[in-house]
Amino acid sequence: SATPSSDGEKVFVTTGTGEVVAFDVSGNEKWRFNAQDRYGKFRFGFGFHSTTVLHEGRLFLQLIHSAAQLVVSVDSTTGKEVWKVERKSDGVAECEHSYASPTAHRQGDLSVVITHGNDYCIGHDPATGKELWRIADLNPKDRYNRTLRFVASPVVSNGFVVAPSAKNRGVSVVRLAEAKGRIGKGGVGELWRMDKGTTDVTSPLLYEGVLYLCKENGTVLCLDAKTGEQLYQERFHGQTYRGSPVAFNGRILFTARDGTFTLLKAGKSYELLGKNKLDDEFTASPAISRDRLYLRGYKYLYAIGTK
C-alpha cells in the first residue's frame, strides 16, 4: 500500500482507488483529487499501490499500467498539476504494471526523480519531467519474461542508485553523478550488475557501503555496494517477507509476515543480534522517527521506544 508523506505542515495520502489528499497536521482537508478521474481508469492486475513522493515542494506520481504510462508532478500547496509526461517503454503484458514507488534525491546541484516499472528504471528532471537517463536490460530481450512486473522500489544512497527487477532476476547499481542516456549492462555510470538474485517485493537497503537484499523467503543476500562482491547469504527466518528492511544505529531490522522481527548487526559479516515476535501480521515496512519505531500490523499500530 502507498505510504503517506509529510513536509511537517501537511500530510499527503494516496489510496488504492486513486484518491490523493492533503491534510494539515490537525486533520483538516486542504485539497483532493482522484488520479483516475484526472488521468484515466487504472488497469493494474493487482491494484494501485505506488506511493506519491514529496520532493522540494512537489508531489510525484508514477502511473504505470496497461492503460497509461505517465509520470506526474503536482504542486503540494494546491494539488494542481505542474507537468505530466509520457514514460516510454517497449515492455508488454504483465510487465506494463508497476507496483513500485518512485524515489527522489538531491546530490549537490543534481536533483532527480526516479520512476520504476515496465522494464526500466528512469531518472527525470523534477522541474520538467524530462528523461535524464534510463537503466535498461533489467528484463533482457533474449530471455524476456512477460510476467516480470516490478514491485520493489529503487533506492538512492551515497551517490548510488540501486535498481532491482523482480522474481530473482537482475539488479543494477549506478553512480548517480555519472548516469547518462541508456544504461545497459556495463553502460555509462554503471558500477556493476548481477543477472540474478534480486528481491521481488521488498526494496533493497543500502547502508554504510553494504547492500542488503531481503528475499521473500527470509534469506538476506549481502553485497559490497561498490563492487557487487557477495559478502554473505543467510536464511535467518523461514517466513514470508513483504515489508522492506530498515537500518538504525548500526543495526538492520527485518519484518516477517508472521510478526517476527529479526535484528542483524550491520556490516560485512553475518551476526544475528536477536528476534522478537508480536501477535499480529505485518506486510508494511517499519518507520523510524525521533527514536521510536512504528509498526503497522493488521490489527494494531505499534510505537516502540526506550521510554
Positions of PLM-derived features:
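Noncatalytic, solvent-exposed loop/strand surfaces
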Residues: 1-307
